[in-house]
């Protein structure tokens, strides 16, 4: 830790001074701050350079003995973009619409897949910040501030500045007391065995606990929480309770409807439409942790309510068919949640395995420092936040254009973390690392 902090200080001081003198503009460079800004700048430039492309899709509504459903035309021979895009001049689309109106239609295939999702791991700080950003719209800084109040003043949650998502066996042994304290207010959300059945190795693993374990409620039932404190406490409680719930099970059905005669018949063009529908089989842990109300699938025309009983070979009537104007979308701007994830996984972009492995544990920054890094970019004018979205400013773009690749990529952090790992194993000296 001492080596890391001293080296960070030297890099920040020397590079910041050099670029400030070279440009007559006060600039700040940091081992974590600058690669994080580089990700924002790369995204900003991609958004500015983006030119939307207009295209057409064809949507049809079918009706048979089991009910109505909607589908989107696709070319099975084209893999790009699912084969759904047609030129905007409308010539090809008009020909397809005319053919489809003439029918007939029949279901060519029905495929169902079941997806089972286990309950999520407990919160470390970064995951809590991501979750609060998605559900509450909070910045990483605000989440940390409220979590600190819950920990220091209200004694309601455990230490929040943790990078672990597991519990030690000793802490897990206290969970029955925690659940007992939660029962009066939260008992309706308990699954069978909550607080009685010990959590398994997915949650309890001494080897995966660093200095501090995952964030969980304490056995102290909090009182007089303000609105913000209650909202964050609610997330922490629900995440713990979810651990005793079962998997979330959903069944996704994909139907291909062929129009234009019996599929495969010679001399006939067969147009195919894809329809998909998802049905929750078992809510499981999502009964405790529902997704944000704002989280919706993109309108790709394929996700639809499918009537039960659809089967291969069933004849369908074409009720309606039309082309729909669409356009490609620019890359999405970072939010606190997605930028925290990008920082956490930055090492995966490194080609050299040793450097990538060295960053697996922390990525860029640590859970305790990432919120501060984001706020530093904002206060120094390198980035700005509009609603939940981050964007790089002109000042930030200028800085990234000036600094060398080695400083704005995660490689510097990777090299340092590899050297510091050697120091922890007793394979080197701090003085040598500092001189290098």
Question: Model regions: which residues?
Answer:
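Phosphate-backbone binding and catalysis cores of DNA-processing enzymes
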Residues: 1-114, 195, 209-279, 283
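Short alpha-helical scaffolding segments that buttress acidic/His motifs in well-ordered protein cores
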Residues: 7-10, 146-147, 434
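Short amphipathic alpha-helical segments at helix boundaries and their inter-helical linkers
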Residues: 11, 47-53, 155-161, 429-432
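Glycine-centered flexibility motif
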Residues: 12, 30, 284, 313, ...
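Hydrophobic alpha-helical segments
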Residues: 22, 26, 47, 172-174, ...
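Structured DNA-binding interfaces in DNA transaction proteins
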Residues: 87-232, 240, 244-252, 263-265, ...
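Short, His- and charge-rich active-site/binding loops that engage polyanionic ligands
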Residues: 279-293
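Non-catalytic DNA-recognition/assembly elements of restriction-modification systems
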Residues: 411-436
């Amino acid at each position: 830790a001492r080596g890391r902090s001293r080296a960070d200080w030297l890099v920040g001081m020397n590079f910041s001074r050099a670029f400030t003198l070279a440009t007559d503009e006060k600039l700040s460079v940091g081992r974590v701050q600058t690669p994080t800004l580089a990700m924002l700048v790369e995204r900003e430039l991609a958004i500015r350079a983006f030119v939307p492309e207009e295209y057409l899709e064809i949507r049809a509504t079918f009706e048979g003995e089991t009910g109505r459903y909607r589908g989107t035309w696709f070319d099975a021979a084209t893999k790009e973009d699912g084969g759904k895009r047609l030129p905007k001049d409308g010539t090809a689309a008009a020909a397809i619409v005319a053919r489809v109106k003439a029918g007939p239609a029949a279901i060519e295939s029905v495929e169902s897949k079941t997806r089972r999702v286990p309950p999520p791991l407990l919160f470390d700080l970064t995951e809590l910040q991501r979750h609060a950003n998605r559900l509450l719209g909070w910045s990483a800084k605000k989440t940390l501030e409220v979590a600190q109040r819950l920990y220091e003043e209200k004694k309601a949650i455990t230490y929040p500045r943790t990078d672990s998502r597991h519990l030690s066996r000793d802490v897990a042994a206290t969970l029955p007391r925690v659940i007992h304290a939660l029962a009066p207010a939260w008992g309706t959300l308990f699954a069978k065995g909550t607080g009685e059945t010990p959590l398994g190795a997915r949650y309890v693993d001494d080897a995966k606990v660093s200095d501090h374990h995952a964030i969980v409620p304490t056995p102290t039932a909090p009182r007089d929480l303000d609105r913000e404190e209650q909202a964050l406490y609610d997330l922490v409680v629900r995440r713990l309770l979810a651990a005793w719930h079962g998997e979330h099970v959903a069944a996704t059905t994909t139907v291909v409807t062929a129009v234009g005669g019996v599929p495969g018949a010679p001399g006939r063009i067969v147009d195919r439409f894809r329809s998909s529908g998802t049905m929750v089989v078992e809510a499981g842990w999502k009964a405790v942790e529902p997704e944000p109300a704002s989280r919706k699938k993109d309108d790709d025309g394929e996700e639809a309510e499918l009537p039960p009983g659809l089967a291969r070979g069933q004849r369908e009537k074409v009720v309606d068919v039309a082309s729909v104007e669409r356009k490609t979308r620019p890359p999405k701007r970072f939010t606190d949640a997605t930028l925290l994830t990008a920082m956490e996984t930055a090492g995966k972009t490194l080609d050299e395995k040793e450097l990538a492995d060295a960053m697996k544990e922390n990525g860029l920054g640590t859970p305790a420092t990432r919120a501060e890094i984001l706020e530093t970019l904002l206060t120094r004018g390198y980035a700005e936040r509009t609603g939940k979205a981050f964007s790089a400013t002109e000042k930030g773009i200028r800085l990234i254009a000036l600094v060398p690749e080695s400083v704005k990529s995660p490689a510097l952090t990777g090299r340092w973390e590899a050297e510091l790992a050697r120091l922890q194993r007793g394979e080197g000296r701090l003085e040598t690392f500092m001189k290098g």
